[in-house]
């Protein structure tokens, strides 16, 4: 159209007001947001609102290109822009930034878990051998996974759970192969959870390769005494926020130990797992993966419905073995 004599008379769209943390990338972000509307035939008002919102999100975050929003983030921000003056601190927006970019799809994965620490230490002690031999054992187990991948044609469908206490060399050997890799952060058998690494867990995760999935085992029953339950919830919230911030996927291994008898877990046909998952979702804790004990067919259906309702971006469920007989595992998968 005609260019007005005064700039104040030109077409304009106000931008959301945000706390500025970074001065780079706003122009690129504006153009990307503008084009996301223009290429779909939107009018200039919509295009400019999307462009302004994209630019606002980038300057409200640290970094440049990595701060660019996805369409889901942009839609959420536009719907809440009036009250989101500090986008960097909004948990839902940070979660969307974590889960909505394109990620590798795992429709099926066969995982060999050998992140055991206290159990293998005890076996070594019983056998009268030094625990110093355990790192070599874990390297051999990585070789076993590689051989299984080759012989059974499981490329892109195989993985391992490996610790960094006895398995640091094994982790290095497994990383970079395109495997699904989980790495535990909890001190074995700690209840409430104690993180094994020294220092804030958020700082620790910043040094992990992005392909390694943060795995945490948590003993949690919705009927636990309030102090213990709250301690576990606080630790899981801290871990969830740290993993989201560092860009790592999170696997939450949930074991509903019976209150008053932590050596035994609740049966798979009661609702303790479902109630525990619901509680975590209510707290804003949305792990990318769940690791759950075998459940009844009815419970699996309820879990599937719960995940679909509360976290459509969930990566899936890994089923716990817990030394169960093969017949029980087959039934649980069915």
What are these regions (language model features)?
Residues 175-186, 232-251, 303-319:
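Alpha-helix-loop-beta-strand connector modules within alpha/beta enzyme cores
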Residues 160-163, 212-232, 269-272, 276-300, ...:
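Catalytic beta/alpha-barrel core
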Residues 112, 253, 290:
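Conserved, mostly hydrophobic/aromatic
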Residues 86-226, 315, 327:
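Alpha/beta catalytic barrel-like cores
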Residues 225-266, 273-276:
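Internal active-site segments that recognize and position negatively charged phosphoryl groups
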Residues 1-90:
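Conserved phosphate-binding/catalytic region of the ribokinase-like
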Residues 136, 140, 231-245, 275-279, ...:
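Alpha-helical scaffolding segments of alpha/beta enzyme cores, especially the outer helices
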């Amino acid at each position: 159209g005609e260019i007005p004599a005064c700039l104040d008379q030109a077409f304009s769209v106000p931008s959301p007001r945000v706390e500025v943390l970074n001065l780079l990338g706003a122009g690129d972000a504006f153009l990307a947001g503008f084009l996301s509307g223009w290429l779909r035939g939107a009018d200039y008002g919509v295009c400019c609102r999307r462009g302004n919102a994209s630019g606002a999100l980038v300057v409200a975050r640290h970094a440049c290109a990595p701060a660019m929003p996805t369409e889901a983030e942009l839609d959420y921000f536009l719907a809440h822009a009036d009250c989101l003056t500090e986008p960097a601190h909004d948990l839902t927006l940070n979660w969307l930034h974590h889960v909505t970019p394109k990620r590798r799809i795992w429709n099926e994965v066969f995982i060999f878990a050998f992140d055991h620490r206290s159990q293998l230490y005890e076996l070594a002690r019983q056998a009268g051998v030094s625990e110093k031999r355990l790192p070599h054992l874990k390297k051999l187990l990585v070789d076993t996974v590689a051989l299984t991948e080759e012989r059974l044609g499981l490329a892109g469908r195989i993985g391992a759970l490996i610790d960094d206490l006895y398995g640091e060399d094994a982790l290095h050997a497994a990383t970079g192969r395109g495997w699904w890799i989980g790495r535990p952060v909890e001190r074995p058998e700690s209840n409430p959870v104690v993180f094994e690494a020294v220092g804030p867990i958020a700082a620790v995760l910043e040094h992990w390769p992005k392909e390694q999935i943060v795995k945490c085992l948590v003993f949690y029953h919705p009927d636990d005494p309030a102090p213990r339950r709250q301690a576990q919830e606080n630790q899981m919230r801290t871990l969830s926020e740290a993993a989201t911030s560092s860009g790592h996927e999170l696997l939450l291994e949930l074991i509903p130990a019976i209150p008053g008898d932590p050596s035994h877990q609740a049966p798979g046909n009661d609702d303790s797992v479902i109630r525990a998952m619901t509680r975590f979702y209510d707290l804003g804790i949305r792990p990318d993966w769940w690791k759950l004990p075998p459940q009844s067919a009815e419970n699996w259906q309820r879990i599937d419905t719960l995940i679909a309702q509360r976290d459509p971006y969930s990566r899936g469920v890994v089923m716990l073995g817990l030394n169960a007989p093969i017949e029980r595992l087959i039934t649980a998968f069915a």
